[in-house]
Amino acid sequence: MSKTAIIFPGQGAQKVGMAQDLFNNNDQATEILTSAAKTLDFDILETMFTDEEGKLGETENTQPALLTHSSALLAALKNLNPDFTMGHSLGEYSSLVAADVLSFEDAVKIVRKRGQLMAQAFPTGVGSMAAVLGLDFDKVDEICKSLSSDDKIIEPANINCPGQIVVSGHKALIDELVEKGKSLGAKRVMPLAVSGPFHSSLMKVIEEDFSSYINQFEWRDAKFPVVQNVNAQGETDNEVIKSNMVKQLYSPVQFINSTEWLIDQGVDHFIEIGPGKVLSGLIKKINRDVKLTSIQTLEDVKGWNEND
């Protein structure tokens, strides 16, 4: 029996013009977009559609924008009936909306706060991230341990696919790794355009504030399992899910293990909902045999709704 997982991308997938094709052209999507505009304390639609002020790349804006786009696409799709859901980092919040753990309005407030806390935690230039290509996890982990000291750390942060491990930590060490990467055996080490050491233990500084903020919202049991970044398995209990979303701030994204867990459960079709095909590309490198569908635009939505 074929099983399906709906999956959602995280930061880095955003682009100017996102969701503009959906607005006023699909009632369900427009409802989500309008709701985001009413709920948030900044002009999210202008930021997503035209971004004249150049704010889309700031994490406190990127996070609600991506959640809103994925949720608008999701609302527009018919006959999905997924067995599981999974998101990459920020994308996990779209999974929580899809599985009815959080209402969209609550989720968009939470990711706005998450972005603000992340942005405030570190002055520009303190923390950063980089993608290490061509080395396995154990080797990257070993390099990180050898570079880290008592007052500066670098750690694996996103275990994306074989040969692609993202590291996170103090910018000085990230810069050192970028410089020394090839001599340490990597094909390349690419710095990422992020403003903080996300998914590293440095993010524990915002744990308390974030935890107390999300406690004010209603968390419900998931309608179908959410495969969580921190433990790479499906969860439905709202307390477990909520606790894992706090840990997610400072824990690595276990994307390889999460994908393999889903395949072990019989999933052979992954539907990526949101801008870009980043996750589909990663999954292809984990398992070439599964079916991949990408839903990014109004045209994709129409194609799905007409055929399924």
Swiss-Prot record:
Keywords carried by this UniProt record: Acyltransferase, Fatty acid biosynthesis, Fatty acid metabolism, Lipid biosynthesis, Lipid metabolism, Transferase
SMART domains membership: PKS_AT
Pathway, per record: Lipid metabolism; fatty acid biosynthesis
EC number(s) stated in the UniProt entry for this protein: 2.3.1.39
Active site: S89, H199
One Pfam entry name: Acyl_transf_1
GO biological process, one term: fatty acid biosynthetic process
InterPro entries: Ac_transferase_dom_sf, Acyl_transferase_dom, Acyl_Trfase/lysoPLipase, Mal-CoA-ACP_Trans/PKS_FabD, Malonyl_CoA-ACP_transAc, Malonyl_CoA-ACP_transAc_FabD, Malonyl_transacylase_ACP-bd
GO molecular function list: [acyl-carrier-protein] S-malonyltransferase activity
Acyltransferase as UniProt keyword: yes
Catalytic activity line of the entry: holo-[ACP] + malonyl-CoA = malonyl-[ACP] + CoA
GO cellular component terms listed in the entry, alphabetical order: cytosol
Similarity-based family: Belongs to the FabD family.
Protein name per Swiss-Prot or TrEMBL: Malonyl CoA-acyl carrier protein transacylase
Source organism of this protein record: Staphylococcus aureus (strain MSSA476)
